[in-house]
Amino acid sequence: SAEQDIAARLGELATFPTESPKTLESDIRVLELTQGFEYAPLQREAIRLALSSRVMVLTGGPGTGKTTTVKAILNLYEGIYDRVALCAPTGRAAKRLTELTGHSASTIHRLLEVDYSTGSVRFIHNEKNLLPFDVIILDEMSMVDAKLFQALLAAARYHCRIIMVGDADQLPSVGPGSVL
């Protein structure tokens, strides 16, 4: 099932060795000084986890600082990773993510590239043609169904970091199997 595949793949990714930057605390402090505010303790913990884990879930209600935390993570990733993808399940959510973070975001379907030549929904990026990203940040995770997330994980490189962002109390996925 899709759920079992997702659990297995996230488990594989989570066990891949990772190392957080030795200067992480000072990097966070420099970011705070540059932006003119301090992160809340839970935001700092989320930032630390994003740089020390392969798989992370960042969840919270509206106005809890998820986007601010994602922006901090993106800023810190810039010096480490060349290929970071931001995506969301809908065009509207991807556009909003681009506006709020200043980084280009796409839909998950666009990231995976739909292959229209087959007559059914297949993706160009899959387990045989992996996505080129070191990090994939998925926003509005509550709206992502199990099949789409399964396809994304199958196309992710074996050492990719996956950050899932969302609000469990928001709109559920239209398709079966709400991931968040």
Protein language model features and the residues they cover:
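Conserved ATP-binding/catalytic motifs of P-loop helicase motor domains
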Residues: S1-L180
